[in-house]
Amino acid sequence: WHELMGCKRGNQCELALSWLRGNNQNIQIWGMSATIGNIEEAASSILGLNSKQPKIIKSNLVKNIEIKSIIPNNIGTFPWSGHLGIKSHKSLLKEIDKDKSTLIFTNTRNQSERWFQCLRYFNPEMEDNIALHHGSLDKEDRKLVEEGVKEGSIKWVVCTSSLDLGVDFQPVDQIVQIGSAKNIGRLI
């Protein structure tokens, strides 16, 4: 739900939920998020103004989050599009464990494809353990990648934000964000 709050799609979703509530007073509405901080506000926007008290279920799970920035000593000529940060692949590879499940997020499909090719080129031994995932891939191809991660046969996935919506991987050991995250909720 955190992806919908405060944007045009979220407003459209709220209007649709309002219409559904108007047509069926007994409808049950569920909202879920693994990262949302303002649960009461989200519940209010999902359920509407004149709703019953929501039932909020929270996990007591505590996760240790380590955030580390990889910034090159010399930026040189800064690439403003497409191949953002690709020159820092060696620094990135020092941080990624080949045996750990890792999601490598980029902000665009083009970046994900470039990083995927770069990581494959510099890690031929990972050929069968690295995959690409973005919304423009065939649905069956995306499903194969998701199943490979869940089974453990795929260790690294270079992906766009299409992978952070509605996909639950157990466990993901590392997450890498190349470039700035679209928002702090996505980063965490």
Regions from the PLM with identified roles:
Residues 1-188:
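Helicase motor core with emphasis on the C-terminal RecA-like subdomain
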